[in-house]
Amino acid sequence: MAAPAGGLGDAELREAQRDYLDFLDDEEDQGVYHGKVRDMISDNQYRLLVNINDLRRRNEKRANRLLSNAFEELIAFQRALKDFVASVDATYAKQYEDFYIGLEGSFGSKHVSPRTLTACFLSCIVCVEGIVTKCSLIRPKVVRSVHYCPATKKTIERRYTDLTSLDAFPSSTVYPTKDEENNPLETEYGLSVYKDHQTISIQEMPEKAPAGQLPRSVDVILDDDLVDKVKPGDRIQVVGTYRCLPGKKGGYTSGTFRTILIACHIKQMSKDARPLYSANDVAKIKRFSKSRSKDIFNQLARSLAPSIHGHEFIKKALLCMLLGGVEKVLENGSRIRGDINILLIGDPSVAKSQLLRYVLGTAPRAVGTTGRGSSGVGLTAAVTTDQETGERRLEAGAMVLADRGVVCIDEFDKMSDIDRTAIHEVMEQGRVTIAKAGIHARLNSRCSVLAAANPVYGRYDQYKTPMENIGLQDSLLSRFDLLFIMLDQMDSEQDREISDHVLRMHRYRNPNEQDGDAMPLGSAVEILATDDPDFAQEEEQELQVYEKHDDLLHGPNRRKEKIVSMEFMRKYIHVAKMIKPVLTQESADYIAEEYSSLRSQNQMNSDIARTSPVTARTLETLIRLSTAHAKARMSKTVDLQDAEAALELVQFAYFKKVLEKEKKRKKQVEDDSETEKEEEEEETQPEKEGRKQRRKKARTEGEEESYDPYDFSDAEQEMPEVQAHTPKTPESSATGEAKKPELADPRLKAFKAALLEVFKSSHAQSVGLKNVMESINRDNPEPFSLAGVKVALAHMQDDNQIMVSDDIIFLI
């Protein structure tokens, strides 16, 4: 065969055309491509998809030549297709200038990534996998121009080819304006033929790029029906011809060439890198969900990141994030997101980054980045200038590339405020809107955000409120569904457990690891075909539900706890995400009632502060977490137990105790040191159980009426419960012993009722003490003394119901 530069001779070209025509005309055989051509005609298409494996079986020599000498062979193949279409439907063949061939199947050594695409593949058919990072605008390119000369009444036709077409030699780019006799020509635009033309850039997959090296990219030329098939962020396989373009500078061709890929077929890879599972796997998943229906959520949460000790609530939240809620697009076009965003804030060395790394390895699609290494446009999208044409083009950022996945941002507090503001729209609306340099575009970025940050002071200061420690604006915090504060606490028993756990991790060794060999980070097996040939074999492999117990890996004390294997976890999450649970009326009423309780200031104690503001987004958070919990149970409805589990997570994440600084005293009781130790242990326990019992008791006592700012009876009922669950510091208990004489409960209730009438009758927020004394003692058979009134006012001031200043009573 002649070299590619010389091209095929006419005889060889005709022979190749005959071979391809015989391959297509298989009506006497199985009739596969005869039927495909008829389907192409009925669908009004002009590109036929051919499996290279079929051609290899019928004519191996021709298949090898097609892969190694693509330009001439593809021209012969397309001519054969046009002849075959003309024999089937002559009228349809005249409608289109050309018919095109698309290839799929197994390409073997020619199945490459942008990094392994080298000069040896020039003029060959290759299959390249990558992720789309840039897309140019669609431009019309002239294929044939028709010109009319009014003087001679003649018509001139000219065809144009360049290096992006299959022809060996490009035609002249001069557009005719005069004929040979210098008569002016008029262009007949209606008779001229144009084709669509677009350039995209694909980059190698982030998970397949070698660590520490920049990802490589390659430009792809799309023509005709292939344009606008992909957008930034899509993962695709491109089959096409690899070609080099000479670079001209000042009329001279330089020695370096620019390489491009001329596409003939594009296949969208699955948006969710879905695991392969068989009917047997689905049966195991259903059996597992039914057998462990009571504690299946806790079982899965314990199996998340088993190498990390503790953090039970955070693991439950991460499981909810991986499962996700249900996204809703309303009729008016507005979208209610189903993605769950989580922020981890805490001291150094509490496994924040390790949890992020685990999610990166578990989620089907995850992109990891850091605060210092990310800019606002790098996370969302950027408008860049094409060096070749000078036109503007859109470049996708990390959040667009992670559409339908998870974005893990470490060192979130190190980002600048301007860059953090750029992700506001992404976190709530799930899209990126760009309006720059004449480009107005909207890209999907429906992803969950998992961020880890350190407090403002490096370590968490428990004597300051959470808001002072976090140092992020409320507009950003309200977009996070859950905010967890992770503390490095001084507890000898817990430290002993952690040290034992970490030492066991260092002593553990994978049984498959050989001496002196490091295990690979990713899978060493790559599929060198557009379709997975080993799909059936992988289906037959037995799916292990539980990991085999190992004393070093799981600990000798956890023999009874079964850990779900990573592969089963991936498949279970993928199946559970497909379920769309519906809220029941009971759970909806419960969520609405608990949301109003969270908003109420009466739930706040003096030493408890909120980690993030409770807004209307908190209501959506409760719904999303309830839905995720229902998905874990494989339930089609969101029941009351799901709503209660979601509320438990929210209570743990939203409330944080603030310590009071101790004042030095000259005399200290011996028991003080013991009580302080007990209080420090109590501070480590979350306050959720106390609040949950208080709300349940309050609901049974009939606190569902509308809120009255002048009514003090509710607070009085709650006060003994609040005191029962609020540990007091030694100073507060000591000062409490030296208080003024107590007022009897009936007298205190009578005073509150009288004061209520005074405020209602005066229609004011503040009343003088003198006026109060006159009003409450008027027509009162048992008048209040001034000392008794002051004791009652002190009680109410302690309950944050009023404030007394300069004998003026202010209503709070």
Swiss-Prot record:
Catalyzed reaction equations: ATP + H2O = ADP + phosphate + H(+)
EC numbers: 3.6.4.12
Residues reported to bind ATP: A524, R665
Region (Disordered): 663-741
Gene Ontology molecular-function annotations: ATP binding; ATP hydrolysis activity; chromatin binding; helicase activity; single-stranded DNA binding
MCM domain residues: 296-503
Residues holding ADP: Q354, L394, E395, A396, A398
GO biological process, one term: DNA strand elongation involved in DNA replication
Principal location class: nucleus
Keyword Phosphoprotein: no
Family, similarity comment: Belongs to the MCM family.
Name of this protein: DNA replication licensing factor MCM3
Originating species: Gallus gallus (Chicken)
